[in-house]
Amino acid sequence: MSQDVREVNFDGLVGPTHNYAGLAHGNVASMRHGGLTANPREAALQGLAKMKSLMEAGFAQGVLPPQQRPDLGALRDLGFTGDDAGVLAQAARQAPQLLRAVCSASSMWTANAATVTPSLDAPDGRVHFTAANLQSSFHRYLEPRTTARVLAAMFHDPAHFAHHPVLPATPTFSDEGAANHTRLCGDHDEPGVHLYVYGRQAFGGEHGPKRYPARQTLEASQAIARQHGLDDTRTVFAQQHPDAIDAGVFHNDVIAVGNGPVLLYHEMAFRDETATLEALRARMSTPLIPVRVPSEAISLEDAVATYLFNSQLLSNPDGSMTLVVPGECQENETVWRTIQDLLLGGNNPISEVLVKDVKQSMRNGGGPACLRLRVALAARERQALTGRVLLDEALHDDLAAWVERHYRDRLAPEDLADPLLVRESLTALDELTQLLGIGAVYPFQLN
């Protein structure tokens, strides 16, 4: 029975305060580019261009709005007082790193927004959402409350959508969302198996990274599977290789990407590669198609530098697949040759590679896959969405014009204390919620 299920990629709009603050420990690109001058307008338009090109290629594309930044409420909670200008000036003088954190536009990476289970797999026949607590870093810990509000506004109809509490924001339940989750299936309109990848086990775990933190726990992944009603026949929990995390693979989507029955991964993606593949094969009703990239072909360092595995793997109507890679892959001769010989030339469904320029995002450590949250939706569920959140040409043009009106083309670290930036951002976001038709979702609209 066909339900016309389509996977929709909901990309995050880059916010007006996009900057390079070097906030993310363990994210090599973010740390390397901290302090550079950013171009928020270019970043947002690059993201929109990627969305539009995929929409024009026939893929279903959605939009998620950015967060309210600077988060002056967070600064006030931390003891800074006075009017907005005074709070900004105090923070810039006394704690510049905190100011940079509350201005972060990191919500653009919607792969970390939530973990999603489609209605095909859920016992109650609804789409299930759990916004990620992102407790590993302060600048991202600020996101979940607004994220949950945005998701509840867009996916509002309780007949079709279920929203679960964010997990407790403690190291035990550290959760970074869909960046550590892949659904494997024969096709998007068939039941799937959920691969949850964790970096460490809070209770009783022995193996973990030594250099950089593991941001996802087994306990968090298990809790989300329970919330969504998934049993052992639909779930596989696999540990990410600690050496990969120490090489800068801070999420599993930096070292592996799955779509349909295909799992494209680096040989260092999982601590126990054989057991992971066997567990998937035992649960899947369709044969798994593993596409393994050995270290001899691409080193961990090149995988992190080019974000090959942070590509989007998308299904075409004829059963073939398109791989959407960042421009950095084409610039690296070794990686580009491997794409041609091993991926396009191999015995797998990958038949096309599209190269996208997302440099403004890449400098903060986010490739094409970081920028999107995958949600498989039946026709009735797409019709139940609130507002204008599925991209068409008119919405793209409206959003591009909105960016041109409101975004700066230059934002240096010293600009973050400018009180005008607050006013500009709130004006832009207020207009955006009207443009998208999702109602009041931001703190300044609710207070």
Curated annotation (Swiss-Prot):
Any one GO biological process: arginine catabolic process to glutamate
Catalysed transformations (reactions): N(2)-succinyl-L-arginine + 2 H2O + 2 H(+) = N(2)-succinyl-L-ornithine + 2 NH4(+) + CO2
SUPFAM superfamilies: Pentein
EC number: 3.5.3.23
Pfam family, one: AstB
This protein's pathway: Amino-acid degradation; L-arginine degradation via AST pathway; L-glutamate and succinate from L-arginine: step 2/5
Presence of the UniProt keyword Transferase in the record: no
Binding-site list for substrate: 21-30, 112, 139-140, 215, 253, 364
Record-level Gene Ontology MF annotations: N-succinylarginine dihydrolase activity
Active site (record annotation): E176, H251, C370
Top-level taxon of origin: Bacteria
Family: Belongs to the succinylarginine dihydrolase family.
PANTHER family membership: N-SUCCINYLARGININE DIHYDROLASE
Subunit-level organization: Homodimer.
Name of this protein: N-succinylarginine dihydrolase
Species this protein is from: Chromohalobacter salexigens (strain ATCC BAA-138 / DSM 3043 / CIP 106854 / NCIMB 13768 / 1H11)
Lineage, opening ranks: Bacteria, Pseudomonadati, Pseudomonadota, Gammaproteobacteria, Oceanospirillales
